[in-house]
A protein has these predicted regions:
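Charged, low-complexity intrinsically disordered terminal regions and linker tails
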Residues: 1-225
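Aromatic-residue detector
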Residues: 86, 99, 114, 238-239, ...
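Generic alpha-helical structural element
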Residues: 179-182, 234, 249
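Generic hydrophobic/packing signal
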Residues: 204, 208-213, 217, 235-236, ...
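Intrinsically disordered, low-complexity regulatory regions enriched in Ser/Pro/Gly/Thr
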Residues: 227-228, 252
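Short amphipathic alpha-helix starts
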Residues: 229-246
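Short, basic amphipathic alpha-helical segments that act as recognition/interaction helices
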Residues: 242-244, 248-280
Length: 280
């Protein structure tokens, strides 16, 4: 975003690049840490920049502290280069960073930031020195790598029946684990399911248990669907015919039912053995 370099904020902080990250940090420090009342406005707008400048002018002690903090507390952009711009990863990381830092930021400006920007803002606002932040971010990277490994638990969902399986999974969870689904949006595809479990608090063992039960429900449902398409018949075969049926089933590695099905359909198609009845 292009801004006027001669605005009040540039005058108040000469030599600063005043990137959106820095402007957001200044605003959030003043609002959240210093408890200075600020009027809501758009991120990095001239109105925001002027409000920050006036607040700093009224509080020179705060200004001096921020100048020192910028060089000792803000990690370089390169430290966050591994964080994706959007998607599951930055959302999970931001949630974890919120827990790690203990910061609960209610600012409307913070809510307008992307998940990645929120992650960076949390680290910027966290009252720790450069080295501690660097170590915490490195551990967070490792935690994400470990967390993402659990995606394998849900590989069963990835096929042509993905949406149907996800619908069944949501239905099962809603009925059997209402605590997890309360106030959550129903998921309809695998990516949404993964994001749901990112923030569910469920352990890998619990996830595996849930998937196993959902798979059983799926198998039961499929068995019932197939049963609707079939009808059971009970009939008596002579012992000699029964023996032949067993022999055919064994030779062709088929079930007795499958042998009968193939013979009947074959006769219908080729008319080799049953004589046609004369029409009346």
């Amino acid at each position: 975003m292009i801004v006027n370099e001669m605005d009040l904020l540039s005058d108040e902080l000469p030599g600063w690049g005043l990137t959106e990250r820095e402007v957001a940090w200044l605003w959030l420090v003043l609002e959240s840490r210093e408890r200075i009342q600020m009027d809501e406005c758009q991120l990095n707008s001239q109105t925001m920049r002027n409000q920050i400048a006036r607040a700093l002018r009224r509080n020179p002690r705060v200004t001096r502290g921020l100048v020192r903090a910028r060089d000792s507390e803000l990690l370089p952009e390169e430290a966050f280069s591994w964080v994706e711009k959007s998607g599951r990863q930055p959302k999970w990381l931001a949630a974890q960073a919120g827990n790690k830092t203990g910061l609960r930021i209610r600012s409307s400006v913070f809510r307008t930031l992307t998940d990645r920007e929120q992650l960076i803002a949390l680290f910027d606002l966290w009252d720790r020195d450069f080295g501690q932040k660097e170590s915490a971010l490195k551990r967070l990277s490792g935690a994400w790598t470990e967390h993402a490994r659990s995606d394998r638990i849900f590989s069963w969902f990835k096929d042509k029946d993905e949406r149907t399986k996800c619908a069944l999974a949501w239905s099962w969870l809603e009925k059997n684990k209402p605590r997890l689904t309360w106030r959550a949006e129903p998921f309809t595809k695998l990516t949404e399911l993964l994001e749901f479990f990112d923030h569910s608090g469920a352990s890998d063992e619990e996830k595996e248990l849930y998937v196993d039960k959902i798979k059983r429900r799926w198998s039961t449902q499929k068995t019932r669907e197939k049963a609707v398409e079939k009808k059971q018949y009970n009939f008596v075969l002579p012992l000699s015919v029964n023996a032949v049926l067993d022999k055919l089933a064994e030779e062709h590695q088929l079930s007795r039912t499958k042998v009968l099905e193939m013979l009947i359909l074959g006769e219908e198609q080729h008319e080799l053995y049953l004589p046609k009845q004369p029409s009346r």
